[in-house]
Amino acid sequence: MDKIRKSDEVIVLTGKDKGKRGVVQRRVDANYVVVEGVNVAKKATKPNPMTGATGGIVDKLMPIHVSNVALFNAATGKADRAGFKDVDGKKVRVYKSSGEAVKV
């Protein structure tokens, strides 16, 4: 089970986008996530007449390591780490600071 999953709201802890908030769009491998509006790079693309794509500079979302992001706790309004707790025989993600279950 992953502590940070797709559609979680996260805050960036380090790097050029420190403090930015965004939603996880997808996981890349086990240790990287792509966050909406964070770590955007400019990529040059060639025109392709077969697909009708025009060339130029395109913004591309790049992966960021999961250790550089933390879950956003709406109750406190701050970044929070996630842990796991056994509730009725099921493994549930909880916020480390409050022990409340993470809303999906």
From Swiss-Prot:
InterPro entries referenced in this protein's UniProt entry, alphabetically: Rib_uL2_dom2, Ribosomal_uL24, Ribosomal_uL24_KOW, Translation_prot_SH3-like_sf
Protein's UniProt keywords contain Oxidoreductase: no
Cellular-component GO terms for this entry: ribonucleoprotein complex; ribosome
Any coiled-coil regions, as ranges: none
CDD domains from the UniProt entry: KOW_RPL26 (cd06089)
One Gene Ontology MF term: structural constituent of ribosome
Gene3D superfamilies the UniProt entry points to: 2.30.30.30
Pfam families given in the database record: ribosomal_L24
SUPFAM superfamilies tied to this protein: Translation proteins SH3-like domain
Keywords associated with the record: Ribonucleoprotein, Ribosomal protein, RNA-binding, rRNA-binding
A Gene Ontology BP annotation from the UniProt entry: translation
Role played: One of two assembly initiator proteins, it binds directly to the 5'-end of the 23S rRNA, where it nucleates assembly of the 50S subunit. One of the proteins that surrounds the polypeptide exit tunnel on the outside of the subunit.
Similarity remark: Belongs to the universal ribosomal protein uL24 family.
Name used for this protein in its record: Large ribosomal subunit protein uL24
Source species: Janthinobacterium sp. (strain Marseille) (Minibacterium massiliensis)
